[in-house]
Amino acid sequence: MSSQETYEFQAEITQLMSLIINTVYSNKEIFLRELISNASDALDKIRYQSLSDPKVLESDPELFIRLTPKPEEKVLEIRDSGIGMTKAELINNLGTIAKSGTKAFMEALSAGADVSMIGQFGVGFYSLFLVADRVQVISKHNDDEQYIWESNAGGSFTVTLDEVNERIGRGTILRLFLKEDQLEYLEEKRIKEVVKRHSEFVAYPIQLLVTKEVEKEVPVEEEEKKEETEDDKKPKLEEVDEEEEDKEKSKTKKVKENVKELEELNKTKPLWTRNPSEVTQEEYNAFYKSISNDWEDPLAVKHFSVEGQLEFRAILFIPKRAPFDLFESKKKKNNIKLYVRRVFITDEAEELIPEWLSFVKGVVDSEDLPLNLSREMLQQNKIMKVIKKNIVKKLIEAFNEIAEDSEQFEKFYSAFAKNIKLGIHEDSQNRASLAKLLRYNSTKSVDEQTSLADYVTRMPEHQKNVYFITGESIKAVEKSPFLDALKAKNFEVLFLVDPIDEYAFQQLKEFEGKQLVDITKDFELEESEEEKKQREEEIKEFEPLTAALKEVLGDQVEKVVVSYKLIDAPAAIRTGQFGWSANMERIMKAQALRDSTMSSYMASKKIFEISPKSAIIKELKKRVEDNGAQDRTVKDLTSLLYETALLTSGFTLEEPASFATRINRLISLGLNIDEEESTETAAETATEAPVEEVAPETAMEEVD
């Protein structure tokens, strides 16, 4: 025998196998689903290769998956005539290179997740250790010799040139040496049960080697022949053809014997070719699990066909939960399997479905696409674009159907709200349809989310726009000073607290003819003639104060204005219409690779709004009139007011230390502590404050 080569498992794989082999998980049958799924993938690869090079199938023209139980050896064999693995692939794929999902699956498992999720993480092969404590993988690739990969789930595995087993032409045999308490998986009945439950809709024949009792005609025994000879000596009646026939028959007899033969377990025709009215929900659920590696039933299914100039059939499934790597950009999405006239082509047709719908799983079978589709043809093919357009349309229909059941829609929205918002941002054609699916908490719906359509029905007659506020969380926005004036007018405000919300609304711009207005930016609020008149008077009255505040704050603000949109709060900071909001500025600052030039360009000039109704503002106005803008107390109070407004308006402070110094001075004042008693450090920090030079007297001594 050829010399063995021993390799160490990658550390994460060793941990994974240890977790699996020692699990107390009861539903261990899923190992067969995972291994059949891997076999099906290997067959997909060789069939796809054969479309451009038919010679690759010469090593074994038949495409199949074969299950062979060997009770006497306590071994279950799973064979496929797929693409097979080279020596290097056996080493890398099964042992030394951990897949991205290895660690993620272990973390999920430690957190109490179901072992049956293993396929979603791309490490389904190792599920065999649920039932086996040793495995041999015998594999033959067209470009290499036949090799044996072997492991007992320890820290290492061996690879050997195969000189002992039968030649398999092409493909892979998994030889599982079952644990003593898992021998049920050698029973014909149990195997059939598991295949029917999990793998009935695999596209290739799954054959099971079964033992059947058959009747067979065999020659009669010698004694019987002798008796026959004696009978021949007796006088006979005239023979006829029938008697001759009987005579022939009498020379054989029927006996029962056991024979082994292959039985196909998945004869059901492809589900998508059947009429939707003939397919049961159980069949849809089973089919979904077979193509998705999910252990749960789908939330919804859309089964349809398109006929006319273009023909295709599709079954699309919406899962109950988002996969762990939904927004992992480097991972290839392989959720939609593309067939052409029942022949599998690829599960990497990214052109078939937009990225924002990448959570949808299913099958598309086209009658019109060519069988020899290349990557370039997929990207440029007009038929693909039409199929994609139809798929998106049907899925939006499905989402609206889910929305009719509030409980189901809540599950859907909690899992895939980000996808809907991404769709609004990216898909201009379907933006208006998707907007109907959006749900938000609001000033009138704090505990339950509301739709934009319901918002519009609640709008007072004189309200012209749909108002929203952006922020980090509901708690951060529900006490915002920006809400006061709108609440006073009975105008509802939507709370947008998901970072993607603002991107979506920037593209959406309007809903049912009503403008979407961000109240953290400068905007025109509906007002009566009386309110307009009062505002004009207040602007005139507070003009000296706004000029003084602008003088103190300088370039920190674009302008200081008297606000008619504030009630309780003394001041707030709004941004211009076309720059970033405070929330967007926060999001962009968190981007590690942000463009600093773009940041300085888009960071909008700030508008400092003061409320003429506020007692603080009225007192500050009086101080300015008495002492002028350069008064120490006026300057200090202005800076404190501005920095506080920055915080309540959702901004971050550029110089928190200066702000802290001013607050500490206020605390000292409240506690009747003289400035001389303050620490030297505090005094030094105060000198660094940007708004003034340090005066010899207590900065806030005049404040009551």
Curated annotation (Swiss-Prot):
A Pfam family assignment: HSP90
Binding site for ATP: 38, 80, 99, 125, 375
Main location as per UniProt: cytoplasm
HAMAP family in alphabetical order: HSP90
Function: Molecular chaperone that promotes the maturation, structural maintenance and proper regulation of specific target proteins involved for instance in cell cycle control and signal transduction. Undergoes a functional cycle that is linked to its ATPase activity. This cycle probably induces conformational changes in the client proteins, thereby causing their activation. Interacts dynamically with various co-chaperones that modulate its substrate recognition, ATPase cycle and chaperone function.
GO biological process, one term: cellular response to heat
Protein name: Heat shock protein HSP82
Cell compartments where the protein resides: Cytoplasm
Domains (record comment): The TPR repeat-binding motif mediates interaction with TPR repeat-containing proteins.
Keyword Ribosomal protein: no
Biased composition (Acidic residues): 690-704
PROSITE patterns membership: HSP90 (PS00298)
PANTHER family according to UniProt: HEAT SHOCK PROTEIN 90 FAMILY MEMBER (PTHR11528)
Motif TPR repeat-binding positions after renumbering to this chain: 700-704
GO molecular function annotation: ATP binding; ATP hydrolysis activity; ATP-dependent protein folding chaperone; unfolded protein binding
Region ranges (Disordered): 219-255, 675-704
Assembly and oligomerization: Homodimer.
Species name: Eremothecium gossypii (strain ATCC 10895 / CBS 109.51 / FGSC 9923 / NRRL Y-1056) (Yeast)
Biased composition (Basic and acidic residues): 226-238
Gene Ontology cellular-component terms listed: cytosol; perinuclear region of cytoplasm; plasma membrane; protein-containing complex
Biased composition (Low complexity): 680-689
Taxonomic superkingdom: Eukaryota
Family: Belongs to the heat shock protein 90 family.
Keywords: ATP-binding, Chaperone, Cytoplasm, Nucleotide-binding, Stress response
